[in-house]
């Protein structure tokens, strides 16, 4: 049985669900989920959780993410990226200094109106379904945080490569659109690569083709990282005896220690749960009791 985390370098033109469907077949495991959807045109870090490790997805989805994006000025489309229908084109007269000045206004806590071409729902219908019918509905601005927003290079008078570190729920397409609006010339995203998500980086990622090759050699499971690696930021503790018996039956137990979250291991070294100590009592935050170790 496959259990663990695999970081995929998502190829262009694949949906995030396409990747999960492919991995279900390669790993022979139906329980697969990903943390942080990437648009089809985007590439880069897609953390995929396999088997019992899918219990960790809810924690991974909320983390910050880092992207490298192409910002094309002088263009507006209905999708806010270069794949959409062109709505307007303008000449670009602003220089790099003007772009730098505008970027400053997008750093920190801001409000962002989600795009019509998105999977968000309004009255039970996904926005992109309405957009494809030519309909536009009011969307409420949502709070997001842009932790970092920098120009990596200017590729042409009307094109910049930018790096963004942001909170969950940020649409990079919309950020590019809004930057273009602020500059008065319009803007779209014409490339997107995620370099970090949920604490995982491109250096840890493998391609779908690498997974295919490993599966053909009967070694696909060797690409999986144990789920407890995601929780490495929390201190570890090992329990035994009565405490372990109570834990394995889903019960809390007395445990002296500093309040906070811990990785809890059994006497055999297996990862039992993410636990939390509160005033001398250990409780379960999320259990991983059925996870089998990946040798």
List the predicted regions and their residue ranges:
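Catalytic cores of RNA-modifying enzymes
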Residues: 1-167, 172-204
């Amino acid at each position: 049985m496959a259990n663990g985390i695999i970081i995929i370098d998502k190829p262009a033109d694949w949906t995030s669900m396409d990747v999960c469907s492919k991995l279900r077949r390669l790993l022979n495991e139906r329980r697969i989920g990903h943390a942080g959807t990437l648009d089809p045109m985007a590439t880069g870090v897609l953390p995929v959780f396999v088997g019992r490790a899918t219990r960790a997805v809810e924690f991974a989805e909320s983390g910050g993410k880092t992207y490298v994006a192409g910002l094309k000025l002088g263009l507006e489309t209905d999708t806010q990226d270069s794949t959409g229908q062109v709505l307007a084109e303008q000449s670009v007269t602003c220089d790099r200094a003007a772009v730098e000045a505008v970027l400053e206004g997008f750093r920190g806590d801001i409000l962002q109106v989600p795009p019509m071409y998105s999977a968000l729902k309004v009255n039970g219908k996904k926005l992109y379904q309405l957009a494809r019918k030519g309909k536009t509905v009011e969307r409420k601005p949502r709070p997001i945080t842009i932790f970092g927003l920098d120009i990596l290079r200017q590729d042409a008078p009307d094109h910049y490569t930018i790096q963004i570190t942001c909170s969950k729920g940020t649409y990079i397409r919309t950020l590019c659109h809004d930057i273009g609006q602020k500059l008065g010339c319009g803007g779209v995203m014409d490339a997107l690569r995620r370099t970090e998500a949920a604490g995982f980086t491109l250096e840890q990622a493998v391609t779908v083709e690498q997974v295919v090759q490993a599966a053909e050699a009967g070694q696909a499971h060797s690409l999986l990282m144990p789920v407890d690696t995601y929780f490495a930021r929390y201190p570890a503790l090992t329990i035994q005896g009565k405490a372990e018996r109570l834990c394995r039956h889903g019960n809390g137990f007395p445990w002296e220690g500093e309040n906070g979250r811990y990785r809890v291991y059994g006497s055999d070294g297996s990862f039992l749960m993410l636990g939390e100590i509160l005033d001398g009592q250990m409780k379960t935050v999320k259990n991983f009791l059925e996870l089998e170790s990946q040798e």
